[in-house]
Amino acid sequence: MASQVMRITLKAYDHELVDSSAKKIIETVKKNGSQVSGPVPLPTKKEVVTILRATHKYKDSREQFEQRTHKRLIDIINPTQKTTESLSRIEMPAGVYIDIKMKQK
């Protein structure tokens, strides 16, 4: 018997937004009676950009900016039609990227 798995990946620059969104998704799935695995924290991606403060010279004067991308992974095992409909109705905060994939296990 093959089971289906719905894999949800959440990405955002603010870790609190990712955690609150994951909590909303897990509460909704548990209300509908499906099994949940997660949230699994994935490695944080850190991007650093270095620029010169001055326009022409003074190479020793630099400034660094960084951007961190936080990720969480949630697996829903054997999702029902009711579960997928309720997930589509959830209000998510702006700034959270959601990627949903279905897999056969």
Curated annotation (Swiss-Prot):
InterPro entries: Ribosomal_uS10, Ribosomal_uS10_CS, Ribosomal_uS10_dom, Ribosomal_uS10_dom_sf. The gene is rpsJ. The keyword rRNA processing does not apply. The keyword Protein biosynthesis does not apply. One of its GO terms (cellular component) is ribosome. It comes from Agathobacter rectalis (strain ATCC 33656 / DSM 3377 / JCM 17463 / KCTC 5835 / VPI 0990) (Eubacterium rectale). SUPFAM superfamilies: Ribosomal protein S10. It holds the Pfam family Ribosomal_S10. Keywords: Ribonucleoprotein, Ribosomal protein. HAMAP family: Ribosomal_uS10. The lineage of its organism: Bacteria, Bacillati, Bacillota, Clostridia, Lachnospirales. It comes from the Bacteria. This is Small ribosomal subunit protein uS10. Belongs to the universal ribosomal protein uS10 family.
